[in-house]
Amino acid sequence: MPSRAYHEGLWQAVPAGLAPSDLDLRRRFLLAHVDPGMRVLDVGCGEGAFAAALARAGAQVVGIDAAEEPLRRARARHPELDLRLVDGEGEWSLPDAGFDAVWAGEVIEHVADTAAWLSEVRRVLRSGGALLLSTPAVGRLTLLRMALSRRAFEVRFDPRGEHLRHYAPGTLRGLLEDFGFHGVQVRSAGGVPGERHVLLARAVRSRF
């Protein structure tokens, strides 16, 4: 199980957060699926950029993160937001079925116990609510480089790296379906054809 030091270390490694173009790509995807008045949980809210965008769009937002450093930055920039520190791998102190949507931007690849994490997402989502997430993609050109170069493979899948897991569209879709989500949509975005760098997914929580 990753320690709090692991999560804090991620934010020391990326002090500036996402690049503006990457931020905009994910923000447009997120806001396309959220309506005013919806109750939205931002999991791994980081510096609060997405939570702030959701609030401006009229959503009722709660942001949670497993690291104190990004929350400190977020509270300084967005004091109006409801932002909370949680155990990254344990149960969140949030009500059952309390949200219409859960957003997790660049989070699932850092989760050691994916089964427990998805079970917690299901618990806090209402029946019929949507999970929206983004995660880095492994493009075809990257796969080709890894097939041709042992060094490229080792760098990408170094267990000491910041990503604990890597997902392809099919594996992400299958994982979400296995955990009781339906209508799963996964698409590659960003970058160039053959080397898309992000997966964007939407999945609906089943009633059972």
What residue ranges belong to the model's regions?
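Conserved class I S-adenosyl-L-methionine
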Residues: 132-154
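A short hydrophobic/small-residue beta-strand
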Residues: 61, 131-132
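A short His-aromatic
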Residues: 106-110
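Short N-terminal helix/helix-N-cap motif within the alpha/beta-hydrolase-1
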Residues: 69, 112-116, 143
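A short glycine-rich, Lys/Arg-flanked "PGG" loop and its adjoining helix->strand segment in the class I
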Residues: 116-127
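Conserved N-terminal segment of class I S-adenosyl-L-methionine
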Residues: 1-95, 101-105, 118, 157, ...
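Short glycine-centered segments of the SAM/dcSAM-binding site in methyltransferase folds
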Residues: 39, 128-130
